[in-house]
Amino acid sequence: MRRWLKWLAVGLAGVWIGASILFALATDAQPLVVRSDAISPLAIAQARRLLAMHDPRRQQSGQISIVEIPASLIDKGTNYLAGRYLRGRGRFELTEAGGEFRITLPLPGERFLNLRAGIPPADGMPKIGDARLGSLPLPGRLLDYAIAGAVRFSGVDSEWQIASRALRALTFDRASQTVAVTYEWQPQILERARAVALAPDEISRLHHARLALVALFAHRVPGAPVSLAEILQATLPTSKDPRSDGRAMLLVLASHLAEMDLAALVPAARDWPRPRWVRIHLAGRHDLAQHFVVSAALAAWSGEPVADAIGLYKELNDARHGSGFSFIDLAADRAGTRFGDALAKRPARLIERLAGSLRDSDLLPPAHDLPEGLDAEAFRQRFSSPDSLPFKTLARDIENRLDALPLYR
């Protein structure tokens, strides 16, 4: 008996030592990827340009197309996904062998899980090439199996198969810093993408949110002014699932304010009743309500970095082609982003604060003194770029004003 216990103790000690060595080899004391989660307006511009050039609504079934994606855009997307879904950081770079993804995940005890995975050029769906986890080399086939298992576990196996059949080739060009994807378009791709993006229960929530908005505006005179604070207070605090139902309401309200047909996302919405048009305003301005709600919806559904990047991109674009850069609009964007982020991360606390009296001034601090209407030349003269000290100083002032509002503390 004693000999058996002795061998058991030795075996357990061996397992513990082996596990400790494996942990030390697979983890690092320093992160492989260190960066912020910010997304640049350039990335938004690149994504919009690619979508415009390869609009799925204009593609024919069986059409062969090539899309050249900037490596920097894939890099930003990798970091965004790593931050949003893994609470880590990510990077993508072009190498002599193809492309390489790098992921860092923080672990307890000030250790980091650092993964490198190379992707060589391929005909069809690419396979993982060289890979390392910390100091440990990993067989690419092992990661391929892990990805396949994750796809099955997520319930998107059929969508993955459709994408695999559509993908014809993947090539990398270090000179132009682009990744070329050759694909065969099939209408099922768009249909399945919609199904993955919005589950049946989310579509049901969107339907209920649309009906609630229809009922709220039914007794209003068409074109009558309605404050955004009144709408939010009437639709959000009564929800049993504030995060999910709140996201649905923000998306419905954003599509209404932006005059975007919700059927583009949910085909069934073509048969839903439409809300009566009223003039929704924030601080007396309809455009500020638009900025606030669209940014809130983006933050609630996609995260704060995406909402911030799109808001800044729009203002820079307005400076070049539209009504001019407006820091007042930017303040409304940031207020909406904070609202949507709070709904996604701290819904109970936000709803509790909405339950009392709510005014527009609780949503947006005074901003009438901020500069607006700056064309491209005026913006360059005063601020040069969003990276300049004058711009950052004014942006910090906006954040300080938002910090002073109890709703965003």
PLM segments and residue spans:
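Extracellular/lumenal and peripheral-membrane lipid-interaction modules
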Residues: 2-222, 334
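Alpha-helical transmembrane segments that form the membrane-embedded catalytic/substrate-binding core
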Residues: 291-295, 318-352, 356-363
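Function-critical hydrophobic alpha-helical transmembrane segments in multi-pass membrane proteins
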Residues: 277-279, 286-292, 296, 314
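Primarily interfacial, aromatic-capped hydrophobic alpha-helices that serve as membrane anchors
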Residues: 342-409
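Membrane-interface helix/loop boundary segments of multi-pass membrane proteins
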Residues: 297-303
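"…centered on the first transmembrane helix and the immediately adjacent amphipathic helix/loop
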Residues: 192-287, 390-409
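Second-shell loop/turn segments in exported
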Residues: 63-65, 132-133, 279-288, 321-326
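Small-polar-interrupted transmembrane alpha-helices in polytopic inner-membrane proteins
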Residues: 303-319
